[in-house]
Each structure stands twice: as C-alpha cells, then as structure tokens.
C-alpha cells in the first residue's frame, strides 16, 4: 500500500486487530521511507442487488434509506438503535443470500414490514399504512385484526 504522506510504494504492517463486531480489520502501518504511521481499515465489500422501483428505474441499494424509513416508523417507540441495525443486517443477509442481481422495491418493502412486525406492532402499522397507501380506517382495522388472530393462543382441544 502506498504511503499517504510520501507516496512510497511499500509500507509495513505494525499491528492488526479485528473489530469487536468481527466485520473490520484495523491495521497500523509504518512507512520505511518517511517513518510516518497511519491506520487502514479492511472490510468485505458486499455486492447487494440493485433496487427496481415501481416506475422501472433502477438505483443502488442504500442501507441508509432502509434505516431512515425504519427509524421514522419507530419514532418515539421503545426500540434500540442496535435492534434497527440488526434488522437491516438481516434484510441485507437475505438479499445477499438470494443471489439475485436485482430486487423489486415491493419485495424490499415487504422485508422491511416483516422486520418491523417483529420489532414493534405500532411501527409495523405506521409503515404499512404508508407503504400500502391506506385510504380509510377499515384498512387499519384489517391489519389490527390480522395481529389479533396471529397473537391469540390456540384453543385447547377437548378430549373425551
């Protein structure tokens, strides 16, 4: 690696450490020509699929957009930032695992809704109301009824 100070072609690694999350390697380097030290970070470059919007246009996957939309839905809700990061990481993992080069925005929205459903029901309803473009109260009621059915315990069978 070139020295950022004198542009010498070869530098020496003095120390390497793996970050706490295991996703990054921090390296301290020294230039033998000018004797200056600097730090580099090494991480895996992930090739996430492009997002195909409803109008057919394509854009790069942007983790920040997913985080921002989840934060908006979770505003003033008791959900930690770490939980949001973990949810987005699960979405990225699913997208990477699919092997697809493109993902439709509708599919991405469904993945976000699934994560929000597990994190906070209020946030899920907020996101769904915008994402699915609710037009009246009955659509809210349908989603709430769906939650009630899913969360009610099964009735015990009677054996004789």
UniProtKB/Swiss-Prot annotation:
Transmembrane domains' residue ranges: none
Residue ranges occupied by any ATP-cone domain in the UniProt entry: 49-139
Zinc fingers, unnamed class: 3-34
Assigned protein family: Belongs to the NrdR family.
Cofactor(s) required, per the database record: Zn(2+)
Name of the featured protein: Transcriptional repressor NrdR
GO molecular function terms noted in the UniProt entry: ATP binding; DNA binding; zinc ion binding
Native source organism of the sequence: Paraburkholderia phytofirmans (strain DSM 17436 / LMG 22146 / PsJN)
Described function: Negatively regulates transcription of bacterial ribonucleotide reductase nrd genes and operons by binding to NrdR-boxes.
């Amino acid at each position: 690696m070139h020295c950022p100070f004198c542009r010498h072609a070869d530098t020496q690694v003095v120390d390497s450490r793996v970050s706490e999350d295991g996703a990054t390697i921090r390296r301290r380097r020294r230039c033998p020509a000018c004797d200056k030290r600097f730090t580099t970070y090494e991480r895996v470059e992930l090739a996430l699929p492009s997002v195909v919007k409803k109008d057919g246009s394509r854009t790069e996957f942007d983790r920040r957009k997913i985080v921002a939309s989840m934060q908006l839905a979770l505003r003033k809700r008791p959900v930690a930032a770490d939980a949001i990061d973990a949810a987005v990481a699960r979405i990225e993992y699913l997208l990477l695992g699919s092997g697809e080069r493109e993902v439709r925005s509708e599919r991405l929205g469904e993945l976000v809704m699934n994560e929000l459903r597990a994190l906070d029901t209020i946030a899920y309803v907020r996101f769904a109301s915008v994402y699915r473009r609710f037009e009246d109260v009955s659509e809210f009621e349908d989603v709430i009824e769906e939650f009630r059915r899913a969360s009610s315990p099964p009735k015990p069978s009677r054996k004789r």
